[in-house]
């Protein structure tokens, strides 16, 4: 099938991952409780090996007891949760397969299971992520409170990361590696990359570094092409965007806003290309970015490319023309800032934490934190439990046949509210199953 004739994942899907099919035409799995495991749990739904669409009949925070891996061929529709939505807490969540669509979920790890001794690997968990997977689109998710990176995804192919809020990794927490004299200060945003990855309208806030780090040709990856456009980076500390050994990158129309924690030496930094023993510097097309407080850099983005090496290295690193990608709608950095703070993250029902982060960005306040809730290092976990926002359950719609589509919507569209099989049929559209049409209709604004 010609690429241009394929069906996009959902209205508003953009970039290299936009043709991901997820669970289209598969079975319905309903998350009906907040249990760690068992019938009706989130874990049961995401670990099935069949094509499926996951919907929610519950709202609140799911406190995981062990790490969780999401198997492929799945669509997870967080926007279906009644009330204030869903948060996954306490353990890391990872992608364990290809062809995955995830929308409107929150991943807020915290340090409950990160606390331990100074042993290599302790405190090494991301809030959410996945490596070497293909056909992935992560849309309107909120991630925070990691011990390694908040959200890392690299080494795969055909990936889109859009409208995600990445904030408040735990800096002086319990991350320890061999040779350290103390737990590291490791409040990092994420490692991003892949053969073809698009990242747009994401917000990084209060991350010390890796906003993101481009993986480059390392850690099992041979080549990398990333379109990093129309994102917002706020209050980085000692590095903003960096890395990218041996890869190709468009860095265009992003908005950089230094904050209270930003080191004066990197306030005007757009990107810091690096090299290693195996690969030299990548190639970067840098244009259209706004750096607040650095008028000259905004006018000439190349002044914001900070790198070591020779003058010839710099000439080789800076590309005169953008690399060929699946183009995004044209939007300048100023427009990006306004749209992103309005709609980024799990914004269908934005929780109080995301509201605070957005207010931090607008008012240029906030700081790097060490413990969820902003408590000092070493605070007993039980004293931090109120850091997780309360997510209320409300307005559960009647669904007689338990197919994920409420009776009222089925009757409105001429479907059978007592036939569970019609959710996976393509009665109303040749492109999307009946259930997909319903879950997409919930977020009528594709940028919601």
What are these regions (language model features)?
Residues 8-54:
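Acidic Gly/Asp/Thr-rich repetitive segments characteristic of extracellular carbohydrate-active
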Residues 35-36, 59-61, 80-83, 259-262, ...:
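Acidic glycine-/aspartate-rich tracts in secreted/extracellular proteins
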Residues 391-397, 408-448:
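Proline-centered structural pivot motif
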Residues 213-218, 222-381:
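Extracellular beta-rich repeat passengers
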Residues 43-50, 61-77, 84-103, 109-133, ...:
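Extracellular beta-strand-rich solenoid/capping regions of secreted or surface-exposed proteins
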Residues 1-6:
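Bacterial Sec-dependent N-terminal signal peptides
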Residues 88-93, 115-129, 145-153, 174-194, ...:
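Extracellular beta-strand/beta-solenoid scaffold signature
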Residues 73, 78, 98-109, 132-145, ...:
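Right-handed parallel beta-helix
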């Amino acid at each position: 099938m010609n690429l241009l004739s394929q069906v996009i994942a959902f209205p508003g899907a953009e970039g290299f991952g936009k043709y991901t099919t997820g669970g289209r035409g598969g079975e319905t799995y309903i998350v009906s409780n907040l249990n760690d495991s068992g019938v009706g749990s989130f874990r049961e739904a995401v670990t099935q090996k069949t094509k499926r669409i996951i919907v929610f009949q519950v709202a609140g925070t799911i406190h995981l007891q062990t790490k969780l891996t999401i198997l492929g061929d799945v669509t997870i529709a967080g926007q279906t949760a009644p009330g204030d939505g869903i948060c996954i807490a306490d353990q890391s969540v990872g992608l364990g397969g290809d062809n995955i669509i995830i929308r409107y979920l929150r991943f807020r790890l915290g340090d409950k299971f990160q606390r331990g001794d100074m042993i290599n690997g302790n405190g090494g968990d991301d809030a959410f992520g996945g490596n070497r997977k293909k056909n992935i689109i992560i849309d309107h998710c909120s991630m925070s409170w990691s011990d390694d990176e908040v959200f890392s995804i690299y080494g795969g192919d055909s990936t889109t990361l859009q409208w995600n809020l990445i904030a408040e990794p735990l800096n002086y927490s319990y991350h320890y590696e061999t040779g350290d004299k103390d737990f590291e200060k490791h409040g990092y945003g994420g490692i991003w990359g892949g053969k073809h990855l698009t990242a747009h309208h994401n917000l990084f806030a209060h991350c010390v570094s890796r906003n993101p780090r481009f993986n480059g040709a390392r850690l099992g990856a041979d080549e990398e092409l990333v379109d990093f456009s129309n994102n917002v980076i706020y209050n980085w500390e000692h590095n903003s965007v960096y890395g990218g050994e041996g890869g190709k990158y468009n860095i265009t129309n992003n908005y950089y806003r230094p904050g209270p924690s930003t080191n004066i030496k990197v306030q005007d930094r757009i990107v810091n290309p690096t090299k290693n023993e195996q690969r030299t510097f990548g190639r970067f097309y840098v244009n259209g970015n706004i750096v607040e407080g650095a008028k000259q850099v905004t006018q000439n983005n190349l002044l914001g490319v900070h790198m070591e090496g020779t003058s010839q290295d710099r000439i080789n690193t800076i590309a005169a023309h953008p690399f060929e990608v699946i183009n995004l709608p044209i939007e300048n950095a100023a427009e990006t800032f306004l749209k992103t703070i309005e709609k980024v993250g799990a914004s269908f029902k934005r929780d109080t934490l995301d509201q605070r982060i957005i207010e931090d960005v607008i008012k240029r306040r906030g700081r790097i934190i060490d413990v969820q809730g902003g408590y000092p290092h070493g605070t007993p976990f039980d004293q931090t439990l109120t850091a997780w926002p309360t997510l209320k359950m409300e307005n559960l719609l009647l669904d007689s046949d338990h197919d994920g589509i409420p009776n009222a919507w089925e009757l409105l569209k001429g479907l059978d509210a007592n036939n569970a099989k019609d959710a996976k049929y393509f009665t109303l559209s040749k492109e999307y199953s009946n259930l997909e049409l319903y879950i997409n209709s919930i977020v009528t604004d594709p940028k919601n």
